[in-house]
Every structure is written in structure tokens, then in C-alpha cells.
Amino acid sequence: MTEDFISSVKRSNEELKERKSNFGFVEYKSKQLTSSSSHNSNSSHHDDDNQHGKRNIFQRCVDSFKSPLDGSFDTSNLKRTLKPRHLIMIAIGGSIGTGLFVGSGKAIAEGGPLGVVIGWAIAGSQIIGTIHGLGEITVRFPVVGAFANYGTRFLDPSISFVVSTIYVLQWFFVLPLEIIAAAMTVQYWNSSIDPVIWVAIFYAVIVSINLFGVRGFGEAEFAFSTIKAITVCGFIILCVVLICGGGPDHEFIGAKYWHDPGCLANGFPGVLSVLVVASYSLGGIEMTCLASGETDPKGLPSAIKQVFWRILFFFLISLTLVGFLVPYTNQNLLGGSSVDNSPFVIAIKLHHIKALPSIVNAVILISVLSVGNSCIFASSRTLCSMAHQGLIPWWFGYIDRAGRPLVGIMANSLFGLLAFLVKSGSMSEVFNWLMAIAGLATCIVWLSINLSHIRFRLAMKAQGKSLDELEFVSAVGIWGSAYSALINCLILIAQFYCSLWPIGGWTSGKERAKIFFQNYLCALIMLFIFIVHKIYYKCQTGKWWGVKALKDIDLETDRKDIDIEIVKQEIAEKKMYLDSRPWYVRQFHFWC
């Protein structure tokens, strides 16, 4: 065993030298863990565990930041400690945040209650196709980074590099914004305390959670999502009571505001504006599959199916009911992104319920912290995936003994320090332009997922593989991904339209140019990154394009090791069972 361990270390050192000699970049090589290497790794960890009794807590903490004992930099060093309950709650409450609680105010003002229903229904329908397509691939290939890895495999390395880079930049810039938003939210109760103090506290909390590893992230998100879900459920019940006249004023509201001032504001342009807001409120939906390298893939299908109910219940129903309680002409819906602009808070205040605004404000604070927590998780895992594909320097993929992608966490944490500009007079303008760099990231990522799933299905067909080989099959299939791709293109066009002809008009040509570039600067940045990476790729490989023919796409590397015959038998048995059940039971299993 000692000789095997020494030879394993030598191989790892040779691999490390090879990486360093290539200017920090590595060629993408999928790594298969052999039984012998797994045995050596397990033996090393066993020896390490035996030493724990001889070390104090401080020593163990310091050692956890060191590189793995076998010297490898493989993504297999990530810990699969996320449990199904974590995934399900991340799926249910993961994207319930400021987009729903605050951003929806602008949507109601510009589109009216009916425009909100139409916009969120369209955006939500494409999410179902996107997440089911991503889930199908992820269960088949449960690797860290999910779509960041699949873009290289099914599309083109340059496309994957652009999409992953923009996605990472988005989370880099969102983190300081969310920390500032959390500090400003506290001002609702006490404005006498310097916001810099709150920035420091929230920054420390978010970074500390992620330093506890994926288990810390999972437990925090489980708690955050549970609170958010309970709050939305309670608010839905409250809305029904108020609409029916059960409030303090005992006034029956019904569809009063749908008639006066009306159900649709600004016509078709208003619906387009709502569509853009809705798409960003649903951002982060892909987080469920992003954690596939750190959880048991068996829990993914159930978590993926929860997305349908989340969109229906937490977004469509809650926003429809808010539209019955708040007229779109309410001035508090416009002119800001603070708690006072939340349609949920406005609805409660309009009907004179005194204690609840503070409760909703507390939930908004939790939502902001949840998004900040997700920022570091998403960016660090994507950077780790990019590093192991050879798209960026290998040291971005460093994973310590505790299974943390440490360099990725540190990189986003450094950007988080920008939150201390909270008292700067030009802070708002600076962050508006920083966010413009990654402004289209959400839709671009979803579009790449749709195209990856379409190429995956076509590759399976070209290579003579059956869908019976898949443990999880998208409920909407390849046509669902095609529909989602079409809707994502429509959202990008809608944002282009709203950038050129914003609702309310503009005062000057300078303002028009500013609005356009803040909305579409991302497209120019992406084009520049794509061209630069294409030149680099050409120099490295001698080819301009890395798109593979369908028959040449690798459908085996990183594939989950399963017995296809057993999978087919399990699917057949489940089908026989469901065929004997009533239609509503079949529908429940289909969507849940």
C-alpha cells in the first residue's frame, strides 16, 4: 500500500509540473477515478482522521485549508454532503428574492396586473423547459459546474467560456449590491447607525457561511428558503382574506382595481417590460443543478419537478393576488428599489395592518442575504468547472481538504469588498455600469442550456442510444427546450426594444444612449470575449471551431455509472404501477 501511495503522489506531482509549465493553463482531460486511486485516497483520509484526536480545533481548521493529501486537484475532492431536503428547499425557495418582493413593483406599474400575469406566465413556462432539460443532462453527467461543463461538451469551448465568464461576473457584481441592499433594508427600522457597520456584519456572515463548505451553504439556504416559502404562503392567505373584505376596514375589494384604473398598463410595450423583469426575478433557477457535483444525483429529479409548483404558487398566484390589492397607478411602485417600493408592503399598508410591514421587511432582508450566499456558491463552482476544463488557469480549481473551492470563494469575496463604497456619492452610478457588464447573463445562460440539451438529444439519436438509458427524462422533451430557446430569444429582443423605447420616454439623446448601453453593454463585452478566446483557441489547437459532429460528441465520460437493464426494469415497473392508478395520481407523479 505504501508503494502505491508513493507512486500516486509522484503521478500527482508530475501532473502539477505539467500544469505549471503550460503558463497556468491545462488541456481539458476528463478524469476517471480508478479503484486503486480511490483506495489510496480513502486510506489517506482514514489516516488523516486518526490524527484528529491528536490535534486541537485550531490545528484541524488550519489543516482543512491545505491541499488534499493525495496532491490531486480533481473535482472529486468536492464533498457530496448536500442532502435531498437541501435540494428541494433550494428548488422551492431559491429564487424567491428581491425580484419578487421589490422588483415586481416596477412590473405592476409598467404592465398592470394582467401584464404581470402574462409576463410571468411566459417567462415561467420557458423555465420549465430549461430546468427539465438541464436536469436530464445533469442526472446523466453529475459534474461540478453543470451547464458550464456541458457548453464545452455539446456546443463550443469559446461559447462555454463566454457564457461561464459572464455568469461569474454577474455574481461577482451582484454580491456587493446585495450586501448594500441588506444594509439599506435595516435602515427601515433604524437609520441612525452607519450603514458601513451593517455592510461589515453582512459581509462577514455571507463569507463565513461559505467557508463552512457546501454543508454550510445547504443548511443556510434550507433555513432561508423555508422562511421565504412560509412567508409567501401566509401572504397569499392574507391577500385572499383582504380581497374578500376580511381586513380591518371590512371593505370588499374583489376586482375593483382591475376595472379602475384597469388591468393593463401601457399595452404591448408594458407586457414586454414585465417580461424582462420577470426573467431576472427567476434568475438562479439553475442553482439546483449547479450543485450536482456535491450531492447524490438521486435527489435531483424530485427537486427539478418542484420548479413547476414554485413558479405557479410563489410567483403567479402571489403576484396575481397583489394585483387585486394595489392599483398600478400607486406612486410608491415607482421611483426606487427600496422596501417602500415593494407591492407586498404597499398592499399591507393600504389596508392598515400595522405589524406586518416590518415582518415583510425582515423577510426581504433574509432574501437579500440568501442571494448573497448564492453569489459565492455559484461563482466559485463555475470557476472551478472552468479551471478543470482548461478554460482558465488551473489554480482557480483549487479545492482544499474540506471540499471548498477556496480560490473561487476568495475571488468573489474580494469583489464583495466593493460594498464598502456604500457611502460614496457615485456608488449608484458605478454599480449600474458594473451590472451592465453582465446584464444579459441570465437569459444567455438559459439559452446555452437549451441548446446544450437539444444537441444532447440529437447526439443520442445519432449514436443510436435510447431514452430508456436515462434515469430522468425531461417532461417536455427536446421540443420544450426548443420552445424555451425561442422565448429566451424573445426576452433578449424585448430588452432591446425597452432599451431603445423605454416606457415613459427620455429627455435627451444622451439619456437614450445611457439607457441602451446599460441594458446591452453585456452583448458587446460578450462579443469581445468570444473573439479573444477564438484567437487563443486557434493558436492552441489550429482550429477556429470546436463544435463536434453529433456522432463524435462524448456521451460516456463523467457519465453516472448505472446498470441500464436495471434502470429499464425500474422504469417499466413504475409505468405499470402508474397505469393502474387514477389520472390525478399520474399527473401528480408527472409534475412532482
UniProtKB/Swiss-Prot annotation:
<feature type="topological domain" description="Cytoplasmic">
    <location>
        <begin position="536"/>
        <end position="592"/>
    </location>
</feature>
<feature type="topological domain" description="Cytoplasmic">
    <location>
        <begin position="214"/>
        <end position="226"/>
    </location>
</feature>
<feature type="transmembrane region" description="Helical">
    <location>
        <begin position="359"/>
        <end position="379"/>
    </location>
</feature>
<dbReference type="InterPro" id="IPR004762">
    <property type="entry name" value="Amino_acid_permease_fungi"/>
</dbReference>
<dbReference type="GO" id="GO:0015171">
    <property type="term" value="F:amino acid transmembrane transporter activity"/>
</dbReference>
<keyword id="KW-0812">Transmembrane</keyword>
<feature type="transmembrane region" description="Helical">
    <location>
        <begin position="429"/>
        <end position="449"/>
    </location>
</feature>
<feature type="topological domain" description="Extracellular">
    <location>
        <begin position="109"/>
        <end position="113"/>
    </location>
</feature>
<feature type="topological domain" description="Cytoplasmic">
    <location>
        <begin position="288"/>
        <end position="306"/>
    </location>
</feature>
<dbReference type="InterPro" id="IPR050524">
    <property type="entry name" value="APC_YAT"/>
</dbReference>
<keyword id="KW-0813">Transport</keyword>
<dbReference type="Pfam" id="PF00324">
    <property type="entry name" value="AA_permease"/>
</dbReference>
<dbReference type="GO" id="GO:0016020">
    <property type="term" value="C:membrane"/>
</dbReference>
<feature type="transmembrane region" description="Helical">
    <location>
        <begin position="88"/>
        <end position="108"/>
    </location>
</feature>
<protein>
    <recommendedName>
        <fullName>Tryptophan permease</fullName>
    </recommendedName>
</protein>
<feature type="transmembrane region" description="Helical">
    <location>
        <begin position="515"/>
        <end position="535"/>
    </location>
</feature>
<feature type="transmembrane region" description="Helical">
    <location>
        <begin position="473"/>
        <end position="493"/>
    </location>
</feature>
<dbReference type="GO" id="GO:0015827">
    <property type="term" value="P:tryptophan transport"/>
</dbReference>
<feature type="transmembrane region" description="Helical">
    <location>
        <begin position="161"/>
        <end position="181"/>
    </location>
</feature>
<dbReference type="GO" id="GO:0005300">
    <property type="term" value="F:high-affinity tryptophan transmembrane transporter activity"/>
</dbReference>
<dbReference type="GO" id="GO:0032126">
    <property type="term" value="C:eisosome"/>
</dbReference>
<feature type="region of interest" description="Disordered">
    <location>
        <begin position="31"/>
        <end position="53"/>
    </location>
</feature>
<keyword id="KW-0472">Membrane</keyword>
<dbReference type="GO" id="GO:0003333">
    <property type="term" value="P:amino acid transmembrane transport"/>
</dbReference>
<keyword id="KW-0029">Amino-acid transport</keyword>
<comment type="function">
    <text>Required for high-affinity tryptophan transport. Also transports cysteine, phenyalanine and tyrosine.</text>
</comment>
<dbReference type="GO" id="GO:0015801">
    <property type="term" value="P:aromatic amino acid transport"/>
</dbReference>
<feature type="topological domain" description="Extracellular">
    <location>
        <begin position="248"/>
        <end position="266"/>
    </location>
</feature>
<feature type="topological domain" description="Extracellular">
    <location>
        <begin position="182"/>
        <end position="192"/>
    </location>
</feature>
<feature type="transmembrane region" description="Helical">
    <location>
        <begin position="405"/>
        <end position="425"/>
    </location>
</feature>
<feature type="transmembrane region" description="Helical">
    <location>
        <begin position="114"/>
        <end position="134"/>
    </location>
</feature>
<feature type="topological domain" description="Extracellular">
    <location>
        <begin position="494"/>
        <end position="514"/>
    </location>
</feature>
<feature type="topological domain" description="Extracellular">
    <location>
        <begin position="328"/>
        <end position="358"/>
    </location>
</feature>
<dbReference type="InterPro" id="IPR004840">
    <property type="entry name" value="Amino_acid_permease_CS"/>
</dbReference>
<feature type="topological domain" description="Cytoplasmic">
    <location>
        <begin position="135"/>
        <end position="160"/>
    </location>
</feature>
<dbReference type="GO" id="GO:0015173">
    <property type="term" value="F:aromatic amino acid transmembrane transporter activity"/>
</dbReference>
<dbReference type="InterPro" id="IPR004841">
    <property type="entry name" value="AA-permease/SLC12A_dom"/>
</dbReference>
<feature type="topological domain" description="Cytoplasmic">
    <location>
        <begin position="380"/>
        <end position="404"/>
    </location>
</feature>
<feature type="transmembrane region" description="Helical">
    <location>
        <begin position="193"/>
        <end position="213"/>
    </location>
</feature>
<dbReference type="GO" id="GO:0005886">
    <property type="term" value="C:plasma membrane"/>
</dbReference>
<dbReference type="GO" id="GO:0005783">
    <property type="term" value="C:endoplasmic reticulum"/>
</dbReference>
<feature type="transmembrane region" description="Helical">
    <location>
        <begin position="267"/>
        <end position="287"/>
    </location>
</feature>
